[in-house]
């Protein structure tokens, strides 16, 4: 029997080391003023030598489980979304997280939709939880600092490291309402890393460094996010003014400003934290969700909409009702 599903808890983790724009400008031909004006980013968190997608993800997972009041042994599935896993393709980072948190009864899988990963993972987790009636953990964790070329000022200024997580559980009341996923595979070479079986690393570039065609990505990102928002609203018969919180992927402030303009709303209508965390790829949305939750701004019954785009080119969004935690005041 299919059941209602809600987000029962969230968690996140940001590495303690912070790299400011001024620090970057000491080794790159750029300035703090230029980076802020073109991206909205002022700083980013960078993983330490002993940190990785799995270690950061495990911390975020523990925080989410504590928030939900769920023991690791209760989990039926651990889904990790990452494009910077500890190993090249296998073993899955999900297995490493499962072992670290003691989720001995959970199945594990990695999912890679790049920056859209969490929205896709949330959709998969919702379906599994509805079918099996047991808690599911979604973790999005990225060590982007390990895959950017720190001499390429067009990309290294954009990214940061971190992890976010959410626990989904069966619910008496509707929580998760709608998902919308899509892709345009013709844009696969707009954002990529050469280091796979078909495309070995280019010897003239940093090993496996991320390559991005910014001029191609920007218009796609704006169209995809605007289109997703409008589609989810239309498919659920919802008005934008009825949505309490819009949480977009934190890729670039200019992208969010362009989406807001096309939606005819102020950019402040979106939750924005890119200035302090930069683009953390698939971890972007769950980090923002956790920060918003812990700020106290989300009330029981609030309608929330997430939207993201990423390499592939892929995109995804979710709509859900926020439900108060046990012990929380309504």
Residue ranges and their predicted role:
Residues 1-49, 152-219, 223, 227, ...:
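Condensing-enzyme catalytic core mediating Claisen C-C bond formation in acyl metabolism
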Residues 7-9, 35, 64, 78, ...:
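Buried hydrophobic positions in well-ordered alpha/beta secondary-structure cores of metabolic enzymes
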Residues 8, 81, 112, 135-142, ...:
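Short beta-strand segments
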Residues 41-43, 76-80, 99-112, 145-151, ...:
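Glycine/charged-rich beta-loop-alpha catalytic/anionic-binding loops adjacent to active sites
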Residues 54, 58-61, 65, 85-86, ...:
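Claisen-condensing/thiolase-fold acyl-transfer catalytic domains that form or cleave C-C bonds
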Residues 60-76, 227-244, 292-297:
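Phosphate/pyrophosphate-binding loops at sites that engage ATP/ADP/AMP, CoA/4′-phosphopantetheine
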Residues 126-130, 134-163:
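Flexible, glycine-rich active-site loops centered on histidine and acidic residues
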Residues 205-274:
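A contiguous, well-structured pocket-lining segment that forms one wall/lid of small-molecule binding clefts
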């Amino acid at each position: 029997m299919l059941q209602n599903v809600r987000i029962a808890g969230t968690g996140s983790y940001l590495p303690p080391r912070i790299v400011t724009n001024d620090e970057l400008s000491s080794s790159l031909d750029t300035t703090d003023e230029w980076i802020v004006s073109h991206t909205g980013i002022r700083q980013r968190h960078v993983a330490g030598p002993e940190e990785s997608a799995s270690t950061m993800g495990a911390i975020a997972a523990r925080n989410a489980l504590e928030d939900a009041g769920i023991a690791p042994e209760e989990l039926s599935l651990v889904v990790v979304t990452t494009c910077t896993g500890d190993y090249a393709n296998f073993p899955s980072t999900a297995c490493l997280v499962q072992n670290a948190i003691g989720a001995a009864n959970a199945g594990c899988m990695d999912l890679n939709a790049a920056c859209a990963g969490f929205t896709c993972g949330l959709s998969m987790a919702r379906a599994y939880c509805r079918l099996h009636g047991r808690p599911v953990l979604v973790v999005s964790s990225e060590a982007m600092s390990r895959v950017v070329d720190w001499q390429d000022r067009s990309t290294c200024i954009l990214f940061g490291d971190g992890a976010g997580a959410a626990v989904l559980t069966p619910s008496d009341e509707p929580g998760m309402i709608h998902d919308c996923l899509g892709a345009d595979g013709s844009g696969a070479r707009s954002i990529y890393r050469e280091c796979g079986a078909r495309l070995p690393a280019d010897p003239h570039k940093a090993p496996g460094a991320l390559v991005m065609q910014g001029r191609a990505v920007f218009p796609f990102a704006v169209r995809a996010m605007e289109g997703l928002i409008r589609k989810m609203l239309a498919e659920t018969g919802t008005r934008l003014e009825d949505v309490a919180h819009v949480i977009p992927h934190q890729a670039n402030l200019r992208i969010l400003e362009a989406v807001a303009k096309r939606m005819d709303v102020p950019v402040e209508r979106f939750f924005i934290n890119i200035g302090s965390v930069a683009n953390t790829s698939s971890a972007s949305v769950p980090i923002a969700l956790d920060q918003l939750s812990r700020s106290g701004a989300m009330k029981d019954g609030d309608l929330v909409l997430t939207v993201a785009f990423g390499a592939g080119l892929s995109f995804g969004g979710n709509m859900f009702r926020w439900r108060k935690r046990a012990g929380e005041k309504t």
